[in-house]
Design a protein with these regions (language model features):
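Transmembrane beta-barrel domains of Gram-negative outer membranes and organellar outer membranes
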Residues: 18-163, 171-269
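Sec-dependent N-terminal signal peptides
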Residues: 4-13
Length: 269
């Protein structure tokens, strides 16, 4: 009886968490405690001249407890001459500091931070420490789950540093920015949960924006996506990111994002 209760509680927790797994952003909720995850993000981004940029970002994730989780991520791309090259990596941590749970809803708030190293050339005004710039980001996330609909928003400060050893950040450009996001997702299938083996299908729409602090240049992107959760452990995401407007130089803002993820529950004692 005790074993059945534990399995049931884990199923409820995982099913609820799976409704908040946004493609382009992180929710305030954490992955289940003592779990371990692997993720691989593939981005096919289109430059103005028609050239295709491919970025691969493998990632390891650890749910330390219900409040803390950490990620380690690598950056690989074909932007440099000579084919694919490992350009850098990052460490990410998130602390969930507030939770309010009701019968069919909950509200979460979290703080997060990222520190990245990157050796690639600095080729745009946009600041992006996830794959382009050496630097750091610190921010706040709030996520509301209302039955089958999840709404999440974030605000963060991002700072770019020199891409050592060869590329200094241009002194004529803004080296810091404020980022803001709004994500909405809805569970489309299944209509009723009967088994953890059911495939979850989520549809999402996300808005992603940035405003440079010194020169006040900005952009806003939109990213519709579809997500499949298989047996509550495997995840497949497909999204398209499209620039709505921009007053800054961005090398390749539009493109397709494909993610694969797998979570190992109770991987640590």
């Amino acid at each position: 009886m005790k074993k059945i209760l534990i399995i049931s509680l884990l199923f409820i927790n995982v099913s609820t968490y799976s409704q908040e797994l946004f493609v382009m952003t992180e929710p305030a909720s954490n992955m289940p405690a003592k779990s371990f995850g692997i993720r691989n993000m593939n981005a096919l981004m289109f430059e103005a001249d028609g050239k295709l940029n491919y970025h691969n970002m493998p990632e390891l994730m650890w749910g330390i407890n219900k409040k803390w989780m950490v990620h380690a991520q690598g950056f690989i791309s074909n932007r440099q001459e000579g084919g694919f090259e490992t350009e850098g990596g990052s460490l990410y941590a998130k602390y969930r500091f507030f939770s309010k749970d009701d019968l069919k809803s909950h509200f979460r708030m979290a703080l997060y931070g990222r520190y990245s190293l990157n050796k690639a050339d600095i080729h745009q005004q946009e600041i992006e420490t996830m794959g382009h710039n050496t630097g750091y980001e610190a921010g706040f996330i709030a996520t509301q789950l209302l039955h089958k609909v999840a709404i999440s928003s974030s605000l963060s400060y991002e700072r770019a540093l020199d891409n050592k050893p060869n590329y200094k950040f241009p002194i004529t450009e803004s080296n810091s920015a404020m980022n803001y996001t709004l994500s909405v997702g809805k569970l489309m299938l299944p209509k009723v949960y009967t088994s953890y083996k059911q495939v979850n299908v989520n549809l999402m729409l996300e808005l992603l924006g940035q405003r440079l602090n010194e020169n006040k240049k900005s952009y806003l992107d939109i990213a519709p996506s579809v997500q499949f959760i298989i047996k509550s452990q495997a995840r497949i995401d497909l999204a398209y990111r499209q620039e709505l407007y921009s007053t800054m130089i961005r090398t390749a803002p539009n493109g397709v994002i494909l993610k694969f993820e797998y979570t190992f529950f109770n991987a640590f004692k």
